[in-house]
Amino acid sequence: MKAKKWLLFLAFGLVLSVLAACSGDKTKEPAGTKTNDTAEEKVLKFLNPEAIPSMDPSLATDESSFIYLAATMEGLYRLDEKTQPSPGIATSHKVSTDGLTWTFTLREDAKWTNGDPVTAHDFVFAWQRAVDPATKSEYGPYMMSGVIKNAEAINKGEAAADQLGVKAEGDFTLVVELENPTPYFETLTTFGTFFPLNKKFVEEKGNSFATSSENLLANGPYVISNWSSTSDSWELVKNKDYWDAKTVKMDKLTFKVVKDPQTALNLYEEGTVDRMDLTSDLVDQYSTNDDYTISADTFVYFLKFNQTKSEALANKNIRAALSRAFDKDALVGEILNNGSIAANGLIPKDFTPIPGSGEDFRKVSGDLVKYDLKAAKEFWAKGLAEIGTDSVELEFLADDDQTTKNLVQYVANQLSTNLEGLKVTIKQVPKKQRLALDSAMDYQLQLSRWGPDFLDPFTFMNLWTTDSGNNWTGYSSATYDKLVRDTVSTLATDAKARYNNFLEAEKLLFEDAAIAPVYQSSRAQLVSPRIQGVFVNPFGATYEYKWADVNK
């Protein structure tokens, strides 16, 4: 079925009420102007697409969690408005000549919201906890293995947590030993997994830690209020005990979970909220509105194939067929319609340049998996013959928001139509549940995504190594593992050689049809002119709220 016909089907079957209710009047007063602040209080109001899955820095794995962790906590450094590390709990650091020892000097005026000082011991505890296998952290091993000395051995149970290469020399000096020189380590320290934790508080709370506002401590710009693990609304309130509280202009930021696009639009137009994401069916109506903006990002969406849950998906030719059997250009142009672009590789466009030439990595690596129906059918026929069947049934797991619903229905229809004998059943669940099913490897086909945690291809490529804490697919390649691991070991100081390995590894990943790239996302939004100082990061926490202010 052609994309336009499928889109029309979706429009009539799924969002007819949205289209009927939207006027798209371009002459209206800009939305958001009706949200009035008192002279005593500055407030901005936002929507969130889902509940916050986790406020535990060791257990968080998703975009929403890291956004709110970054707002309420602070690590050694924080990304500024130019996406450069700026002083956080650390005021400065020194690096040894061999690049293996980093010594951080911490400020002495940083406090937790219970009045305790933030010390080097808090970082030692948090980092040890993140790699301790008893914690069952996904991100701890992913972010620290191969970077901090002994992190990998600890996570494998081959060394005790106190052998991690991090120690406190007094209360305000933190010394970190690395496995290999890591030039981007300063940037890593801005990420949520590296945030400190107050050991006494965490241990007192036990299993209740990070399950509600009352079971959290903050050391960052804001304190989260009126939140629990099942909340559909919460607030970020200015943390008056934050060491840099004078810089924080906002008194409060409010957030509400709204999944229905028409409800979100109504809230924006009546001035109840100051920002909302537009779904594809609304973009054309509002693209000339003064508040309309396209916010490009570096998230890449892909199909994950669980090779352990399906005989068909264990077959490389079947996976290769699925990867090529849906029209990605039509998907981004007509189903998403928000500035997103088709992804034909893993590393996003305009993310990182090749050392020496300065060319964009994506351009040099090229299109590795394009829509190719002829090739898809050939791979499909070969795969079916190899597994001895003429039909395959797959369950397609995805989040339950409206945009994702439109997307997965389109992809499922394309796959079922283009590959004879294939039946795809869609299973949509809340994001928190999808993440749990993902880590339990309780799925067959899944729409997933990844946003970079730091500015290096390793943040994407390490996902698919055999022992990665995020590789819940069953994919394993010793050749791929070595290519990626060498970039942080034997080739750590040879920039050109590292990137050659990344190029070769990305090519191998798609020759093996480990995953199927779908698109690199953008956000089409309506943003009130009231908002200023809210920065969008290309890696790490998507939104930075420390410098938020109201434009009167």
Regions found by a protein language model. Name each.
Residues 239-285:
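Ligand-site clamp/hinge motif
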